[in-house]
Amino acid sequence: MLRNGNEGMSTIPGFSQIQFEGFCRFINQGLAEELEKFPTIKDPDHEIAFQLFAKGYQLLEPSIKERNAVYESLTYSSELYVSARLIFGFDVQKQTISIGNIPIMNSLGTFIINGIYRIVINQILLSPGIYYRSELDHKGISIYTGTIISDWGGRSELAIDKKERIWARVSRKQKISILVLSSAMGSNLREILDNVSYPEIFLSFPNAKEKKRIESKEKAILEFYQQFACVGGDLVFSESLCEELQKKFFQQKCELGRVGRRNMNRRLNLDIPQNNTFLLPRDVLAATDHLIGMKFGTGILDDDDMNHLKNKRIRSVADLLQDQFGLALGRLQHAVQKTIRRVFIRQSKPTPQTLVTPTSTSILLITTYETFFGTYPLAQVFDQTNPLTQTVHGRKVSCLGPGGLTGRTASFRSRDIHPSHYGRICPIDTSEGINVGLTGSLAIHARIDHWWGSIESPFYEISEKAKEKKERQVVYLSPNRDEYYMIAAGNSLSLNQGIQEEQVVPARYRQEFLTIAWEQIHVRSIFPFQYFSIGGSLIPFIEHNDANRALMSSNMQRQAVPLSRSEKCIVGTGLERQTALDSRVSVIAEREGKIISSDSHKILLSSSGKTISIPLVAHRRSNKNTCMHQKPRVPRGKSIKKGQILAEGAATVGGELALGKNVLVAYMPWEGYNFEDAVLISERLVYEDIYTSFHIRKYEIQTDTTSQGSAEKITKQIPHLEEHLLRNLDRNGVVRLGSWVETGDILVGKLTPQIASESSYIAEAGLLRAIFGLEVSTSKETSLKLPIGGRGRVIDVKWIQRDPFDIMVRVYILQKREIKVGDKVAGRHGNKGIISKILPRQDMPYLQDGTPVDMVFNPLGVPSRMNVGQIFESSLGLAGDLLKKHYRIAPFDERYEQEASRKLVFSELYEASKQTKNPWVFEPEYPGKSRIFDGRTGDPFEQPVLIGKSYILKLIHQVDEKIHGRSTGPYSLVTQQPVRGRAKQGGQRIGEMEVWALEGFGVAHILQEILTYKSDHLIARQEILNATIWGKRVPNHEDPPESFRVLVRELRSLALELNHFLVSEKNFRVNREDV
C-alpha cells in the first residue's frame, strides 16, 4: 500500500492492541477515578476519619511467574499500594498501605485466574442519552415516546397520551405527571413554564388537585415517592425518605455519565457543562419540548435509529474492570467501618494499616475479581485451539451480558447488518445459532475511541487542501461523523493510479449507496480488507462465495487443530503473517545478538556482552486440549536482528499462519461414499502423518480429610488390585514420566480411610474392640483411573502440596491422533464434511501422470451452496504446486477488470502446463478439468473431473471425543428415562421420526422394547438385564411403564379416570383391574 515513497502509507494496526490499550487505561485512569470517589469514613462522634488518596498509588511486580501461576492454579496478580490518612483526635497519620491484589494482563492480552487463561471481550450497548420513536397503536393513531437511558442502563420514558397529558414512566408499571417529576427534581411551576417552548400545553392538563401537589418541592417528592414506591396512606416528609428515593431512582435512572451528557447536549441542543453528569430538570423539560414538537408537527419527525453505531458504545476491558474495582472499594468501605467500631470497643489505637486488615481487604479485592472472571458472561475462558483463535477472541464484540440483549428476546432488526457497521464491525463473522448477529468481530482496521466508546474506521482524506498539498492524510471517522462525508466505496487500493480519471465512482452517503462524480468525493477506503474481520480476511476469493458460507468458513478456521507437520497455504490473502505474529505463539527476538545454543527448552542469546536465556514452550496443554509447542529455528552461531523469528509455535511456518495442508482433491462422485458432504480420503494421509495432531489431556486428583478426621493417602500399596494395573506407579503411588497408559490403568493410587459399621464387624474384630477399645478401620480404594479414550504417553506430573493433608496431583497425557473415519474436515469456503471411508492409495482415482488423489469431494456441494471460491483456489493451488509458487491475493480483484480471478487462474494453469510439459494441466476444451482414471480398474472416467490443490483443515470435532455407547446407566428422577449426553453416560434418544421409521417396517417387538423395557419400565429393565447376562428368555410384563403412569395421573387431574381390562382368551370374560 505504498505510493511515491511514504505518501498514502497505511499499516494494519496490532490485532491485540484493543485489549492492551483498555488495560493501560484502567491502570492509569480507572483506578484513580474510583479512588477519588472513595468517601472519607467518619465515626458518628467525628473522633476518627479515614481517607484514601488517588494520587501516588503503586503496583508491585507480580510475585510469581506466569508459568507457575498456570501450573499451581494461582491468580497472576499485582499488589496495589495506596496512600491513606487517619485522623484520630488530634493525631494525623499518613501511611502507604496495601489494599489487595489486582489481576494483571499478560503479553497475550489475557488474565490468569486460578491457573486458567481468561479474556474479557468487548460489550456493545445502547449509549446513555435520549431516544425518540413513533409507532401506531391498534387504532392507527401515532404514539410518540422519548426514552432516557442512564449510564447504569436504567430506563425512563416520556409519553403523551390521547388526552394530550405528558407522563413520565419511571418503571414498567408506575407513571407520574411530568410536572410532579420536574418539581421533585427541584423546579417550581414558574421555572417550568419559563423554560419550555409550549407553556400553554403544560398549563392545560393539571387540575386544581394536581396543582396542589406541586406547590412545593416537599409535596412533589411525597407524591413522587407515593407513586414510585406504590405506598398508600398519609406520608410525612423526612430525610430518610429523600435518601431512599435518591438511592432507588435518581442514582440508577438519572446518572447520565460523561457519554450520556455529551449525547443529551447534542440531541437537545443544550449547553450544560460536561462535568454535570446527572439528569437535570432542564434536560427533562427540553426532552418534553422536543416530544411535543414531534406530536403537534412543529418539530422534526426524526425517529432515532437504535441500531446505528452512533447510538451505541463499547464497554471495553477498562470499563468492566473499573466497575469491579468500584464494587470492591464499596465493600472495603463497609469493612473499614466495622473495623472502626471494633477499635472503639477494644479501646486500642488504630493505624491506617490496622484498619485495612488483610482479612477484610486483600481478600475482598481479589475475590471480587475472581468472582467477576468466574461468573460474568463477558469474561470467558481464552480459546487456545490455534493461533487464529488467540488473535480473534480479544476482538469479539458482544451485545449479550448485563444491560444488553438476550439470545431469546433479541429482534431481527437488532441482529441485522447495519450500514454504519461498514469498516467497523465485520458483516460476515458472527456466531451460528441462537446468538447469530448478537456477537460480532471488529473489522481489521477498526479501533475503539476509549474516551467516548465509539468504533472508528480509517479513510483517506481527498479534500481540496489535501489535493493541493499532494498528500493523503489518514483520518479516523466515528459513526456520527462519516454521515457528513461522501465516501468512495470501490477503487479502494492506493496502487490504482488511474482513479482520478474515472468520471463516476460508487460511493456511500448517509447510509445510502450512490454513484457520483469523483470530484465530489471527500474520503475513500484505504484497503480492500477494511470491512472484514481477521477470519473473513483469511478467505481467498471471498468475493466469489455466498456470505453464509463465508461465515461458516471464518468460524471453522477457528476450530482447526494444529497439525504435527504444519504447511503454509499455496493460495492466501497476505494477512497470514500478521495474524501469526499478533497471536504471540512464535518467539521474536527483542534485541539483536548471536545465538550461543538452542534446544527444545531454551535459546541462549549473547547481546551487548550479556547472555540472555529465552525459555520455550514445550508440549504445553491449551484450554482446548491441543498441544502448544515451540520449535527453535535458528542454528548455533547465527547472528540475528531485532524482530527476527527465533522459534515457531504450533500452526505457524516461516512466521505465517499454517492451519491445514495443501492436498490434491478431485470433485467427483465415488460409489456414493461422498454423498451429502461425506469425504473420501486416501490412506496416504494416515500413513504419512499428513493430518496427525497431538492432544494433551489433564487428569487430577486431590487428597482431603474425611468426616472422621482421617486423612486420605497417596500410595502404591493398594490391596485387592491386580498387579498389572499398578505397573506404571513409582514408589510414591504416582505414574512414572514416559509411561504408556491404557484405559483403566491407575494413574495415582489413593486410599480413603473408612470406619467399619457395627454390622460388618467379624467376631475377632468385635473381641478386639470389647477388650482393648480399638476401632477397626478399613480403607476404600479411590484411585485416579484413566477413563475410556484416554490412552497415551505420560509427559508431565505435577505434585502441588499446600499443606500436609492437602495434596493435588496432576497428570498430563499426550495423545497422537491420526485422521480416521468420523473426523470432520473443512476447506476455507464453508465446504465441510465427515470422513466416510479411507481407501488404499492404489484404489484412489489417479491423474494422467500417475499421482493418486488425496481427497474426493462431492461436486453437488458447490452449485447449491454458491461457494465458487473453492474452485478458484483449488485450480490456482495446482498451478502454484507445479510452478513452486505461493500466491497472496487481495479480494475484489474484479475492480481492475471483468473476470480478473478467472483470467489469473487460467493464465497460471497455462504457464504450469507449459513449464511442466503436461498438456493435461490446462486443456482449452475444459480448462481446470482433466481426464482421470479409476484406480481399481485403470479405466478413464466418462467425464473430465475438476482437480486441484486445496488447503484443507482438520477440525477439533473428532470422532474420538464423540463416539459413545451405553448398556445401562443413570436415569432421570422425574421420568425414569435414560439421561441425555455423553458426559453423563446418557442414552440414545429415539425420537418421533425414528418411531415412525420403525412403525413403517412393522417391528412391534423392537418398538415395545425401545419405548418401554429399555426406557422407563422399572421392573422389566432389571429383569431384561439379568436375562441378557444369563442367556435366558426375555420375560413379558403386564404392568405399565412410568410414562403411562404419568399420563394416567395427568388425566386424573382433568377428572378423567382411566382403567384397563384383561380379557380372558378362553371364555372372553372381562376382568376389571385398576391401573
UniProtKB/Swiss-Prot annotation:
<dbReference type="InterPro" id="IPR042107">
    <property type="entry name" value="DNA-dir_RNA_pol_bsu_ext_1_sf"/>
</dbReference>
<protein>
    <recommendedName>
        <fullName>DNA-directed RNA polymerase subunit beta</fullName>
        <ecNumber>2.7.7.6</ecNumber>
    </recommendedName>
</protein>
<keyword id="KW-0240">DNA-directed RNA polymerase</keyword>
<comment type="subunit">
    <text>In plastids the minimal PEP RNA polymerase catalytic core is composed of four subunits: alpha, beta, beta', and beta''. When a (nuclear-encoded) sigma factor is associated with the core the holoenzyme is formed, which can initiate transcription.</text>
</comment>
<dbReference type="Pfam" id="PF04565">
    <property type="entry name" value="RNA_pol_Rpb2_3"/>
</dbReference>
<keyword id="KW-0808">Transferase</keyword>
<dbReference type="InterPro" id="IPR015712">
    <property type="entry name" value="DNA-dir_RNA_pol_su2"/>
</dbReference>
<keyword id="KW-0804">Transcription</keyword>
<dbReference type="Pfam" id="PF00562">
    <property type="entry name" value="RNA_pol_Rpb2_6"/>
</dbReference>
<comment type="function">
    <text>DNA-dependent RNA polymerase catalyzes the transcription of DNA into RNA using the four ribonucleoside triphosphates as substrates.</text>
</comment>
<dbReference type="GO" id="GO:0005739">
    <property type="term" value="C:mitochondrion"/>
</dbReference>
<dbReference type="GO" id="GO:0006351">
    <property type="term" value="P:DNA-templated transcription"/>
</dbReference>
<dbReference type="GO" id="GO:0009507">
    <property type="term" value="C:chloroplast"/>
</dbReference>
<dbReference type="InterPro" id="IPR007645">
    <property type="entry name" value="RNA_pol_Rpb2_3"/>
</dbReference>
<dbReference type="InterPro" id="IPR014724">
    <property type="entry name" value="RNA_pol_RPB2_OB-fold"/>
</dbReference>
<dbReference type="GO" id="GO:0032549">
    <property type="term" value="F:ribonucleoside binding"/>
</dbReference>
<dbReference type="InterPro" id="IPR010243">
    <property type="entry name" value="RNA_pol_bsu_bac"/>
</dbReference>
<comment type="similarity">
    <text>Belongs to the RNA polymerase beta chain family.</text>
</comment>
<keyword id="KW-0548">Nucleotidyltransferase</keyword>
<dbReference type="InterPro" id="IPR037034">
    <property type="entry name" value="RNA_pol_Rpb2_2_sf"/>
</dbReference>
<keyword id="KW-0150">Chloroplast</keyword>
<dbReference type="GO" id="GO:0003677">
    <property type="term" value="F:DNA binding"/>
</dbReference>
<dbReference type="GO" id="GO:0000428">
    <property type="term" value="C:DNA-directed RNA polymerase complex"/>
</dbReference>
<dbReference type="InterPro" id="IPR007121">
    <property type="entry name" value="RNA_pol_bsu_CS"/>
</dbReference>
<dbReference type="InterPro" id="IPR007120">
    <property type="entry name" value="DNA-dir_RNAP_su2_dom"/>
</dbReference>
<dbReference type="Pfam" id="PF04560">
    <property type="entry name" value="RNA_pol_Rpb2_7"/>
</dbReference>
<dbReference type="InterPro" id="IPR007642">
    <property type="entry name" value="RNA_pol_Rpb2_2"/>
</dbReference>
<dbReference type="Pfam" id="PF04561">
    <property type="entry name" value="RNA_pol_Rpb2_2"/>
</dbReference>
<dbReference type="InterPro" id="IPR007641">
    <property type="entry name" value="RNA_pol_Rpb2_7"/>
</dbReference>
<keyword id="KW-0934">Plastid</keyword>
<dbReference type="GO" id="GO:0003899">
    <property type="term" value="F:DNA-directed RNA polymerase activity"/>
</dbReference>
<dbReference type="InterPro" id="IPR037033">
    <property type="entry name" value="DNA-dir_RNAP_su2_hyb_sf"/>
</dbReference>
